[in-house]
C-alpha cells in the first residue's frame, strides 16, 4: 500500500497525474494556507505561442486563510474571457473537444471554495485519464501536525508502507529527517515529461497544464503520455 500527498492545484500539469497514477491513495492537502501567485490559483497554457499564466479570481481576506475557506470574486467575466482565449488558441487543435471537457468543469457553484473547486477538476480529469487512485481530503481526516510529521501520520492512517513524493520535496523531507522518524519507505517520483506534437508553438514548451496535453493528444494519448514519462530505475 502506498500514498502520495499533494495540494489541490489549479489545472495541474501531467506530472501531477503521473504521481497520482502510481499510488493507491492520493490525499489532497485541502486545508493549507493560501499562497499568493502559487499553483493553488494559477497554471500555464500556451497562448499566442507562449506560456502564459491563467489565474483564478480569489478573495484574499486575511494572511492566514486556508484554501478550504478561500472564496471567489465575480467569476462570470473571468469564465467568459477564459473560454474566448481557449477557443482562439486551441480551437483548431485536433483534440479540442477533449480539452474542452476540462474547461467545461470550470463552472463555479455558489458554495465553491478554492479547494473544493480544484478538487472537482482534479477528480474528473483523473477519471477521464483512467487513474484509479482513491482520492481523499486531508481536512476530513482531522490529523494535526506540521510538515513531515503530519505526512507520516496521514500515511499511517492509510496503513501505507510507502510514501511517494515529488522530487521537489526532497530537501525539506531531508531537513525534517523523514526517513529517520518512520519505518515507512520514502520514494521519489521519477518522471521526465517527454516531447509531444504541440500545435501553436515553434519550440516545444514543457510543464504546461494537462489541458495542453489533452488538446494535442486526446484522452487516450494523454493517458499513455503520462505513463511513459516514468524513468526506470
Show where each model-derived region lies.
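Residues lining hydrophobic/aromatic ligand-binding pockets adjacent to catalytic sites
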Residues: 1-233
Amino acid at each position: 500500500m502506498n500514498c502520495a500527498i499533494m495540494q489541490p492545484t489549479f489545472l495541474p500539469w501531467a506530472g501531477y497525474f503521473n504521481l497520482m497514477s502510481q499510488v493507491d491513495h492520493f490525499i489532497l492537502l485541502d486545508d493549507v494556507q493560501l499562497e499568493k501567485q502559487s499553483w493553488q490559483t494559477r497554471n500555464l497554457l500556451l497562448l499566442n505561442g507562449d506560456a502564459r499564466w491563467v489565474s483564478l479570481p480569489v478573495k484574499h481576506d486575511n494572511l492566514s486563510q486556508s484554501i478550504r475557506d478561500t472564496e471567489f470574486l465575480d467569476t462570470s467575466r473571468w469564465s467568459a474571457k477564459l473560454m474566448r482565449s481557449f477557443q482562439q488558441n486551441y480551437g483548431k487543435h485536433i483534440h479540442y473537444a477533449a480539452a474542452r471537457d476540462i474547461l467545461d468543469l470550470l463552472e463555479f457553484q455558489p458554495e465553491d471554495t478554492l479547494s473544493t473547486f480544484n478538487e472537482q477538476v482534479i477528480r474528473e480529469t483523473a477519471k477521464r485519464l483512467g487513474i484509479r487512485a482513491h482520492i481523499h481530503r486531508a481536512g476530513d481526516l482531522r490529523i494535526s501536525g506540521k510538515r513531515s510529521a503530519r505526512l507520516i501520520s496521514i500515511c499511517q492512517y492509510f496503513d501505507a508502507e510507502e510514501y511517494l513524493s515529488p522530487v521537489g520535496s526532497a530537501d525539506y523531507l531531508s531537513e525534517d529527517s523523514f526517513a529517520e522518524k518512520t519505518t515507512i519507505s520514502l520514494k521519489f517520483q521519477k518522471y521526465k515529461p517527454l516531447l509531444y506534437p504541440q500545435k501553436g508553438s515553434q519550440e516545444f514548451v514543457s510543464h504546461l497544464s494537462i489541458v495542453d496535453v489533452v488538446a494535442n493528444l486526446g484522452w487516450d494519448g494523454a493517458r499513455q503520455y503520462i505513463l511513459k514519462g516514468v524513468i526506470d530505475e
